[in-house]
Amino acid sequence: MNDLLSRQMISGENATISQLLMKQGAVVPRHSHVNEQYSWILSGSLKFIFDDREILVGAGEVLLIPAHVPHGAVALEDTVDVDFFAPRREDWIRKEDSYLRG
């Protein structure tokens, strides 16, 4: 996707799962989507940025982001993040993910 972020994903009829490999300093710009999102950090840590707060999520932790909530993230170190989305990410399936491509 860019020099600091790569993604693998698979979608079924009702959900999408993606694995993001993020190098330290990688940024996911502020965005929102119709999907509920569960972010499970396998290694490393991310700082999620919301309108009213920031949340640090480290290895072994999971964060739920409700649908339509604007958010962004910064990798505080090299990070492996598995994201679960429901319903599935139709925008990603249509390759409408330019905000991640930097």
Mark where each language-model region is.
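A short glycine-rich, His/Asp/Glu-containing loop-to-beta-strand
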Residues: 1-29
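Double-stranded beta-helix
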Residues: 2, 16, 74-102
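Structural motif
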Residues: 16, 45-47, 54, 70, ...
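Short beta-strand segments in beta-sandwich/barrel cores
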Residues: 18, 27-28, 44-49, 63
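Short beta-strand His + acidic residue motifs that chelate non-heme Fe in jelly-roll/DSBH
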Residues: 30, 48-49, 65, 70-76, ...
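A cytosolic small-molecule/anion-sensing beta-strand core signal
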Residues: 42-43, 58-59, 77
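Short acidic-glycine-tyrosine-enriched beta hairpin
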Residues: 52-67
